[in-house]
């Protein structure tokens, strides 16, 4: 098995390799793991404690400006095309979001061709952004509050209804982020919406493993990515930790069992 591994926000290949060592030690020794480093510098606007994070560190993108997300996606897709084939993709946090985006884009653009991966593994992952759902243009009112205007894309996720974009799953994460740093941004700010499981015409038919921590401090790390996938082919577990990989031996063993069961199901 050959896996393409994608790190999270303000991470690096080296840090992801270190975090994965406890779980890969429980997997077959002849499996291969290839790591791709993201291409953008993270910002303190997204991660206030960035100065405390070991360097070098990278992000796939910061705020979901359409051009930045597209650049990250195209870079990843080009790498898969040039360096593949890979048997699986393994994404942590924002890297998991990028892995899900890659599969969703394949489903949308090449529905009648084989997926680029036989399986996918997601650790502490969250929903990716969509190029089809339009953007929210956030602006500041005279009262210094954020006012959203929805500009639909190929798909109108509002279905003609008035939605509370400050709370909607498509946009609530971004609202919280830009509201926290609104005095440091230039408005208006146009940001992509996230995919929701209800947005896709059918579940992704790729065998998958989903792992998250019960103490994850990011509320948006939930079951949503799991719900993008065919439940008949998806396996999931939780562990006692937070926004990281499982650390207790019994949890590592269970994680490894889920991965191996998924690999066996491919044959």
Curated annotation (Swiss-Prot):
EC category name: hydrolase
One Pfam assignment: FSH1
UniProt GO cellular component terms: cytoplasm; nucleus
Protein name: Hydrolase FUB4
Uses in industry and biotechnology: Fusaric acid is phytotoxic to plants such as cotton and banana. It has been shown to induce programmed cell death in plants. In addition to a mild toxicity to animals, fusaric acid exhibits acanthamoebicidal, antioomycete, and antimycobacterial activities.
Family membership: Belongs to the AB hydrolase 3 family.
Active site per database record: 93, 183, 243
A GO molecular-function annotation: hydrolase activity
InterPro entries: AB_hydrolase_fold (IPR029058), FSH-like_dom (IPR005645), LovG (IPR050593)
Function description: Hydrolase; part of the gene cluster that mediates the biosynthesis of fusaric acid, a mycotoxin with low to moderate toxicity to animals and humans, but with high phytotoxic properties. L-aspartate is suggested as fusaric acid amino acid precursor that is activated and further processed to O-acetyl-L-homoserine by cluster enzymes aspartate kinase FUB3 and homoserine O-acetyltransferase FUB5, as well as enzymes of the primary metabolism.
EC number(s) recorded for this UniProt protein: 3.1.-.-
Disulphides: none
Alphabetical GO biological process terms: secondary metabolic process
Functional pathway: Mycotoxin biosynthesis
Keywords: Hydrolase
